[in-house]
Structures are given as C-alpha cells and as structure tokens.
C-alpha cells in the first residue's frame, strides 16, 4: 500500500483586513462567539492527514492571536511580511526543516473550510503537483475600462472563482516563491499565480460555495446571522453557592478581590458568584456540577482562583459548538455592599467569559436580616445562564430529545 503524503498546512493571518470595517484585523473578529482565525485553523489542526500546521501572523498581533486560538495544536507562529506573498514565503521557509511532501496554503479569512475540502486538496496535489479549489461563475461577467464602460463579455463557461486551500508539492512551490523573490516579483495575488509564472501546470478541483472569504462588513453581518440562526437549541441553567465567613481581610466576589473584615472558609478562593455561574453553565449543558469537575477533595484546587473554573465552563460550551447568550448572578448578603462594585463585577465576568458586558447582569439583595446571610455569617449567590447550541433532534448521548 502506498504511504499517504506527508502534508503540512500554512494559514496566512498577517493581513490587516481594512475593508472589513472597524473592530481590528478581521481574522480576530468573532462569528457566533468564536474568532475567525480559530474557525479557520481548527479543521487543519484536527485533520488526520495534516501533520503540521504553520500559522503566519503579524508580530504586533501575538497576544491577540494566542488568546484567539488557545487550545489548538499547531507550530509556533512566524511573522509575516508586507504582502501576502511575502507572508506565504515566510511560512514555507519555516516548514523547510520538516520537508513535507505536500503543503496546503489557506487564507485565515476563509473560516468555513471543511475536512472534506482539505482531503480533496491533498488528493489533487498528489496527482498533479499543483492544484486549487474553484467554483463555477453563475453570473454574467462584464469586463470594463477605466471609465466603467463595458468592453467585453467573457464566456463564463471558461471562468472559475479561485479559493483556498491551494495545494502543491512542497519543493516546487518553495522554489517558485524563492525565484519570484529573487526576480523582484511581489505582485501575485495567490500562490497558483506564482506557480503559473514559474511554468507549472495548475489543475483545479471542486471547491465549496460555503468556503467564502470574509471581506466586507456585510459579509460578517450575513454570516453572523446565519450562524446564530443555526444555534437554535436554547438552554437555561441555574446555579447556587454559599460560603461561610472565617478569618481574613478580603473576599473574592465575581472575580474581584474585595476588602472585608472577614474572609471565606473555602477549598478554593470561595468566590460564590463565579461558582454559581459555573454551575449554571454546566447545568445548561447537562454536564454535571462544579464539584464533579473540580472536587473539593482534590488538593490541586486548594486556593485556586475561580476564574479558571468559569473559563473551563465557557470552553465546554465552545467545544459543543455553542455560545453563551446571557449570564446573570445575584449576590445575597448584608455586607460588603455590592452596588458600588456592580459594574466592575460585570466587566470582570465579561473579561473571563468573552461575553459582551451588555449580556452580563449582576444584582444584589439581602435576606432582610433573616438567616445566616442576615446574621452576616456568610454570603450566598444564585445565577442563571442562557446558552445556544447547534440544534439537533438528538441529545448529547445520541438519543432523541
């Protein structure tokens, strides 16, 4: 049996994406709660035939990139150049030490690439050495002059729209890029054009209409609406937590260190607000509770910061392809007073979860001096979480719901 080719992938993410409007480089903007760059990277990182994934980024974006793609497995990013062509060459040079048989070159602005399209690219490159995915042109195309007047109507039967990932034998596309750089040619808009210039025959294979490139604000608006509509399984969970006071000079509440004349008796930092939110999110997922994921008998959680627990719960939602629609927590105590802390608490929860602060509510009440909270023996918190998951008639265990 013939061995499959050793395939690597380059994800080009060094551009600025100015046509996409405000909000920073488009590859770091979110769609349905998930960064575009993460959506583009994951299919390559998890594809069984791709052994190495090489991101190419702008060095100014290092922190943003690392946060956006946390949890994915890939090679350390390399810095890009002034043009897409220079960025691709940087990625190729970084992969040279691995000497793959095939390289796939993909734009981070195409976040809807599928495993099937990646597989077709690998097969095509193995057969012809240079190939790109294309889709048919369905509209009539007009060629115009500088004044916008029509000068020709090309035969659309001979036209195709190019996509990525474009696939090549690694040695030939690396050589083509190096030759173009030596000759001062830096005006190519894709890698297939460089291959053509270098004298290679470039074949085509079936692309995917859904594998669109995000370019304008309208693209983002349309795809956000489409993805959100697909998240039709709306779920709500509730949570409750309580901790008694002990010795200390501060308490942790909703991610903030709050000065107080007492501390919490707790295994972790005792943040009742975040603990209640964790239980609410896990409840919405039907995924146990905070104690089952972080047992108080486990010494590794002794004194642990509760923002880790909340981030873990948020990641569980993302792993199911979902997003958090709303978070609400109610603090029940006499002191400390929550009112002055309400907005900083909302902001901190938003920072931990990645949920817009406009979708985070913090409320406070007392028990009218009744019970343990009324006697100032501790603090309680209730929480609710609304999440949206991809709709399916099947439950998490594969049974009809």
Curated annotation (Swiss-Prot):
Entry keyword set: Isoprene biosynthesis, Lyase, Metal-binding, Multifunctional enzyme, Nucleotidyltransferase, Transferase
Which gene is transcribed and translated to give this protein? ispDF
Gene3D superfamilies assigned to the protein according to its UniProt record, in alphabetical order: 2-C-methyl-D-erythritol 2,4-cyclodiphosphate synthase, Spore Coat Polysaccharide Biosynthesis Protein SpsA, Chain A
Q: Does the keyword Cell membrane apply?
A: no
Q: Which organism is it from?
A: Rhodopseudomonas palustris (strain HaA2)
Which coenzymes or cofactors are required? a divalent metal cation
Per its record, how is this protein called by name? Bifunctional enzyme IspD/IspF
Q: Quick one: where's region 2-C-methyl-D-erythritol 4-phosphate cytidylyltransferase?
A: 1-234
EC number(s) per entry? 2.7.7.60, 4.6.1.12
- Listed binding positions for a divalent metal cation are 241, 243, 275
Domain of life assignment = Bacteria
Q: Which InterPro entries match?
A: IspD (IPR001228), IspD/F (IPR026596), IspD/TarI (IPR034683), ISPD_synthase_CS (IPR018294), MECDP_synthase (IPR003526), MECDP_synthase_CS (IPR020555), MECDP_synthase_sf (IPR036571), Nucleotide-diphossugar_trans (IPR029044)
Site, Transition state stabilizer: residue positions: 19, 26, 267, 366
In this UniProt entry, which residues are annotated as the site Positions MEP for the nucleophilic attack?
A: 156, 213
Molecular function in Gene Ontology: 2-C-methyl-D-erythritol 2,4-cyclodiphosphate synthase activity; 2-C-methyl-D-erythritol 4-phosphate cytidylyltransferase activity; metal ion binding
What the protein does comes down to: Bifunctional enzyme that catalyzes the formation of 4-diphosphocytidyl-2-C-methyl-D-erythritol from CTP and 2-C-methyl-D-erythritol 4-phosphate (MEP) (IspD), and catalyzes the conversion of 4-diphosphocytidyl-2-C-methyl-D-erythritol 2-phosphate (CDP-ME2P) to 2-C-methyl-D-erythritol 2,4-cyclodiphosphate (ME-CPP) with a corresponding release of cytidine 5-monophosphate (CMP) (IspF).
Sorted alphabetically, the Gene Ontology BP terms of this entry are: isopentenyl diphosphate biosynthetic process, methylerythritol 4-phosphate pathway; terpenoid biosynthetic process
Q: Into which family does the record put it? A: In the N-terminal section; belongs to the IspD/TarI cytidylyltransferase family. IspD subfamily. In the C-terminal section; belongs to the IspF family.
Listed binding positions for 4-CDP-2-C-methyl-D-erythritol 2-phosphate are 241-243, 267-268, 289-291, 365-368, 372, 375
Catalyses which reaction?
2-C-methyl-D-erythritol 4-phosphate + CTP + H(+) = 4-CDP-2-C-methyl-D-erythritol + diphosphate; 4-CDP-2-C-methyl-D-erythritol 2-phosphate = 2-C-methyl-D-erythritol 2,4-cyclic diphosphate + CMP
Annotated region (2-C-methyl-D-erythritol 2,4-cyclodiphosphate synthase), positions in chain = 235-401
Matching entries from Pfam families are given as: IspD, YgbB
């Amino acid at each position: 049996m013939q061995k499959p080719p050793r395939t690597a992938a380059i994800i080009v993410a060094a551009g600025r994406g100015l046509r996409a409007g405000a909000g920073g480089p488009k590859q770091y903007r979110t769609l349905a709660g998930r960064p575009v760059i993460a959506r583009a990277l994951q299919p390559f990182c998890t594809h069984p035939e791709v052994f190495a994934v090489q991101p190419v980024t702008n060095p100014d974006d290092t922190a943003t990139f690392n946060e956006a793609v946390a949890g994915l497995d890939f090679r350390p990013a390399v810095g890009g150049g002034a043009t897409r062509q220079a960025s691709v060459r940087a990625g190729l040079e970084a992969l040279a030490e691995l000497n793959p048989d095939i390289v796939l070159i993909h734009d981070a602005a195409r976040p809807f690439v599928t495993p099937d399209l990646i597989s077709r690219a690998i097969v095509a490159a193995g057969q012809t050495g240079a190939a790109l995915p294309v889709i048919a042109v369905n509209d009539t195309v007009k060629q115009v002059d500088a004044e916008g007047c029509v000068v020709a109507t090309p035969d659309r039967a001979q036209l195709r729209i190019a996509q990525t990932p474009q696939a090549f034998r690694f040695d030939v596309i690396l050589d083509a890029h190096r030759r173009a750089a030596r000759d001062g040619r830096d005006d190519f808009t894709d890698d297939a054009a460089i291959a053509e210039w270098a004298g290679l025959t470039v074949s085509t294979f079936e692309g995917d209409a859904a594998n669109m490139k995000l370019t304008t604000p309208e693209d983002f608006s349309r795809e956000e609406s489409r993805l959100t509509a697909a998240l039709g399984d709306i779920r709500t969970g509730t949570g409750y937590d309580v901790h008694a006071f002990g010795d200390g000079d501060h308490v942790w509440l909703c991610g903030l260190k709050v000065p107080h004349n007492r501390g919490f008796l707790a295994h972790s930092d005792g943040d009742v607000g975040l603990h209640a939110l964790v239980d609410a999110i896990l409840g919405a997922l039907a995924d146990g509770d905070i104690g089952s994921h972080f047992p108080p008998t486990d010494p590794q959680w002794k004194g642990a910061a509760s923002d880790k627990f909340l981030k873990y719960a948020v990641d569980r939602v993302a792993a199911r392809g979902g997003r958090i629609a709303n978070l609400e927590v109610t603090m029940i105590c006499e002191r400390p007073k929550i009112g002055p802390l309400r907005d900083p608490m909302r902001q901190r929860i938003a920072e931990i979860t990645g949920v817009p602060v406009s979708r985070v509510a913090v409320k406070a009440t007392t028990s009218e001096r009744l019970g343990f909270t009324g006697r100032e023996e501790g603090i309680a918190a209730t929480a609710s979480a609304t999440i949206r998951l991809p709709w399916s008639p099947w439950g998490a265990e594969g049974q009809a719901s």
